[in-house]
Amino acid sequence: MGEVKRVLVIAPASVVPVWPKEFDEYADFPVMCKTLLGSKKQRLENISGLKGCHNKKLCVAAVNYESVWRDGIFEALQDYDADLVVCDESQRIKTHDAKQSKAMHQLGDMARYKLILSGTPVQNNAIDIWSQYRFLDRTVFGDSYYAFRGRYAVMGGFNNKQIVGYKDLDGLIKKEHSIAFRITKEEAVDLPEQTFEVRYVGMPAKERKLYEKIRKDSITELESGGKVTAATVLTKLLRLQQLAGGFLVKDGADKPEKVSTAKLDALKDIIIDYVVEGGRKLVVFARFIPEVDAILKLAEKILPKNRKAVALYGGIKKNERGGIVGQFQTDPDTVLFVGQIDTAGTGITLTAADTCVYYSKNFNYATYEQSLSRIHRIGQVNRCTYIDLVVGDSVDEKINIALMKKENLAETVVDNWKQYF
């Protein structure tokens, strides 16, 4: 730590809030870690706050990729003058001429130490590695993307501008591995069979204002409505949970209105990383039918044409459900399973995937516990990963805390209902 006093971490927006929590849990030395989220003013204030970080503390700034190249932010990050720059999920800078990639190259050139972290640094295109290594160590593959492409890619197609194949991949891999450390889940013997990860989602300002209004109105109604029952509290929490997922059910309306895509955008990143480019299968659980429908529409847009998604929810006939599960388990082209947690969370086997995303959960611990076992059961040969999409400072966090305590909200919510709002 004597040589590294200031660290800059660049990560996907949903991962940025995880970094301070990880430092708190695992660092055995003093750390001040600030997340650079929110408005431009807030981000600049947080960067400025780190300038006064005590010399005996490691100072860490964590920012999302989409912000790093913005006017004002980029210059402030340069002034921060990090000793170590970390690219978390470094495949986000695989496109050599993207603004965020170019910004990262410049920040990397200023830093003494650099680190990239990725489960899939090379996805569908071996050429993806150049931009990441241009940041990490420009001496490995050189400064010229086009020279690199000429060395390892076979060009063809219209005007000879399309990559139609690759050459000397053994040489490319040898150079890549010369400064890389790779370990699989199977090789990580100290890794638990089940790993849990939280991805935090920011609520847009307009929806946050609406959320706060509904939250305050709910508290007022409960305080002035006489006897508080579990049913009345859960009904109001349900509405807040729907809003956290991006949907609002207006009074008297038959159908919910989509008011935000923040959670869907976070899920989109995961599907692209794990399925589209990682070549893996994925299970997604959601509580509400409109969420399931929205996820299916998202999948239709981003999955390759020869890849499919299936869904299992309450409206599916029971005699059709086995076929849907079987298709996901056996068909290599069926790569995404979207399940309504109350319907698909019990009694089925989904071991074709080793990763499960929770878009939303219900209030029942038993249902949640059962859903964990859909991918973690006999027939699973890999360690399992569970990713929670959580809107910060919302009912999502309260539900997560209750479920981690193995509580059923329907049984505990009456005694201290205000804590859930």
Model-flagged regions — what are they?
Residues M1-A11, L77, D190-E212, L222-I348, ...:
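Conserved Helicase C-terminal RecA-like lobe
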Residues E3-E25, Q123-D128, R287-I289:
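Conserved Walker A/P-loop ATP-binding site and its immediately adjacent core
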Residues R6-V7, E25, M32-C33, K41, ...:
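Conserved P-loop NTPase motor "coupling/switch" region that bridges the ATPase
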Residues I10-N55, C59-V60, A309:
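Conserved nucleic-acid-binding Ia/Ib motif block in the N-terminal RecA-like helicase ATPase lobe
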Residues T35-L44, Y65-R70, K94-D97, A286-P290, ...:
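Conserved helicase motor
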Residues Q42-V60, Y65-D81, T95:
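Conserved helix/coil segment N-terminal to the catalytic DExD/H
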Residues W69-G72, N124-A126, V292-L296, G322, ...:
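SF2 helicase motor core recognition
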Residues F363-F421:
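A conserved SF2-helicase RecA2
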